[in-house]
Amino acid sequence: MSFKTKLEKYAKLIVQSGLNVQEKQTVVISASIESYQLVREVTRQAYLVGAKEVVVHYSDEEVTRMKYENMAEDDFLQVPTWFSTFRNDYALMNACFLYIDDENPEMLAGIDPKKISNWQRAVKKACKTYFDLSDNMTNAWCIVGGATQKWANKVYPDMSNQEALDSLWNAIFKAAKIDEEHDPVELWNQHRQSFEKIVKEQKLRLD
């Protein structure tokens, strides 16, 4: 099965099972620029099931690191209005949120942890509406894996760049039950049903 076909199946799974995108619903995607192929395929799949709009927020880890290296500690206490408005408004519009976890795990190595914590606290406060609606499951959200070169090289240090990247993608596809014979959406539906059955049986025993 080609990489393109695997990516299509993965994106379909994300849209239909991970986010359960509804007709006329807005989808907000956050990802690094390296994950553009997955972002494009998720966008296509979302529109196929009737999404109203797909909004993409890209980041660049090199730019992000330069930001932390050069900005003052107190600057991370201020969240731009556009940033909080973006998250809060889309949450109030009942959008669903996809986060593609594809960053180099050592992207912020050596950065002053105070800067990072300042930004996290400031965002939590400024985007309270967004976090409240996510925490109580009003808004659907999902975190999925995406392969990037630096992450792949970290996981498979003895391989060439392309071999490492291919291996990481294959590991992600395998974890998501992407194969040639089965529909991953149906497989995950069966998995969910079996899990729900176990939970119900356990609850009956406890009662």
Predicted regions and their residues:
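Active-site bordering "gate/hinge" segments
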Residues: M1-D207
